[in-house]
A protein has these predicted regions:
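Nucleotidyltransferase catalytic core that binds NTPs
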Residues: 1-151
């Protein structure tokens, strides 16, 4: 398919797309000639954590629109064995919150990179901030005395 090209695969949910997602995708882009980005389906994400806020079709369209992305594909499983074989992946990049989970790909000749998110932004932190802000304002509204109009 991509003769004599270094093929890099990265994957994620990419819910509430943010700068750390972009940094990881750009990092992956720099490791090879072709970048394939797997976007986890809503069904896959829901099998191990709360469902995404942003629907799958919107998330994959956003990832496809990035300059760094050559191909965006649905990701239906957390096991990347088949995708590595099918697409002849040379390198795999994933966030360091998955550290150690994909070491098995190295036995298949794939270089595995765990991208350091650091203490920066994450989809989970964004969701928590939104919830906390909403909760704070809701409580403030509930504590406010209703207005009475004098006739």
């Amino acid at each position: 398919m991509f003769n004599n090209k270094t093929i890099v695969y990265t994957s994620g949910t990419f819910d509430m797309f943010h700068t750390n997602h972009l940094k990881m995708i750009n990092y992956a882009r720099g490791l090879g000639d072709v970048l394939i980005v797997g976007v986890s389906t809503d069904e896959l994400v829901s099998s191990y954590k709360a469902p995404p806020i942003i629907p799958f079709n919107d998330r994959i369209q956003l990832v496809e629109a990035l300059k760094a992305t050559d191909i965006a594909i649905p990701q239906h499983t957390l096991d990347h064995t088949e995708i590595v074989k099918k697409l002849n992946i040379d390198a795999f990049v994933v966030g360091d919150d998955w550290f150690g989970k994909y070491d098995y790909l190295e036995e298949m000749g794939v270089k595995v990179f765990y991208f350091p998110y650091g203490n920066g932004i994450s989809s989970s932190s964004l969701k928590k901030t939104i919830y906390d802000t909403y909760d704070k304002h809701l409580k403030a509204v509930q504590q406010t005395k209703p207005l009475t109009i004098k006739k």
